[in-house]
Amino acid sequence: MADKKLDTQLVNAGRSKKYTLGAVNSVIQRASSLVFDSVEAKKHATRNRANGELFYGRRGTLTHFSLQQAMCELEGGAGCVLFPCGAAAVANSILAFIEQGDHVLMTNTAYEPSQDFCSKILSKLGVTTSWFDPLIGADIVKHLQPNTKIVFLESPGSITMEVHDVPAIVAAVRSVVPDAIIMIDNTWAAGVLFKALDFGIDVSIQAATKYLVGHSDAMIGTAVCNARCWEQLRENAYLMGQMVDADTAYITSRGLRTLGVRLRQHHESSLKVAEWLAEHPQVARVNHPALPGSKGHEFWKRDFTGSSGLFSFVLKKKLNNEELANYLDNFSLFSMAYSWGGYESLILANQPEHIAAIRPQGEIDFSGTLIRLHIGLEDVDDLIADLDVGFARIV
């Protein structure tokens, strides 16, 4: 299927007859105990328990295997581990490869829980973490240490949406610490708009809760990795008891079938909104990777095949508490909620000092209130009209 276009891959990935048993979709196989017909069958399952053979519920069922196979086909990986959420995927992927005395190098624009895991959990295990600017490129060599075991990327960055120069970073890391494991939180690109493993990254992690599920009604994380990382990542996750239920795996597989159509609409609508915002007199700047002038836009243009629905913009004005509540409380189409990636449009706000507080170096370069949008599948003109009315509330 690698020679087929993305939409064709998304429709067909993981849908072998072994997993569908004659239906269109993979079967939902809920099981803890899986029965062996004979002693020899038990021995066979035991020998092949890590290679897609039915063995025990914690190793997975046909439903899980179908999704894992699909993710490997889509991201070009040797294996895929499923986790109960994106944060679990990040934490357990890191844990699989570090030990006392190691060093983790993480972008300072990583998702806040990813940063907290390093600073609050890994620090107790004798693992140090330091941070790098997302636009550092080849200069990342200045932050590498002999004991650097993991380099963790997130592109675009959380909230402020900076795009890494991934080829420059990967080349620099390989030249200094060639055995380091390079990971990326690839959620924004849904694992398909940026093919991380093709760029030399070892582990591509997603909160599949977002675009893969696509309907804001299930939580799941994925980690797709290359051959050198697969066994260690797989076995660590198994020993840590990481798994998802069959129904969630099924919902995620079903979400893949419409992912291409949804992503195109997210791209088209979010870029139209971003372009409109860029011309608005109350907006200081727009952080959208596909918009010229956004930080790292040139790397997005070179390395990505599209964009999704999440971006942010900065107001020229810093809203006080009353103004902010009046602004956020009165939208008709934008809801306030954490997460994103569903069919619905969402809005949240951050004050500059709050963003500075969750950045390791505390550095930000704006003074107005930041607004984060997820542009859903509603008519884009209706969304722009709702935003336009919102601006009238904060004049």
What do these predicted ranges mean?
Residues 1-61, 69, 371:
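N-terminal "arm"/small-domain region of PLP-dependent enzymes with the aminotransferase-like
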Residues 2, 10-19, 80-280, 287, ...:
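Conserved PLP-enzyme active-site core in the AAT-like
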Residues 3, 10-27, 323-360:
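C-terminal core of ALDH-fold dehydrogenases
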Residues 38-88, 113-120:
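Conserved N-terminal alpha-helix of the aminotransferase class I/II PLP-enzyme fold
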Residues 76, 147, 282-285, 333, ...:
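Glycine-centered tight turns that cap/initiate beta-strands
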Residues 119-120, 128-130, 149, 262, ...:
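PLP-dependent enzyme catalytic core of the Aspartate aminotransferase-like
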Residues 224, 312-314, 374-376:
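Short hydrophobic/aromatic beta-strand micro-patches
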Residues 271-332, 336-341, 355-362:
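Conserved small-domain helix->loop->beta segment predominantly found in fold-type I
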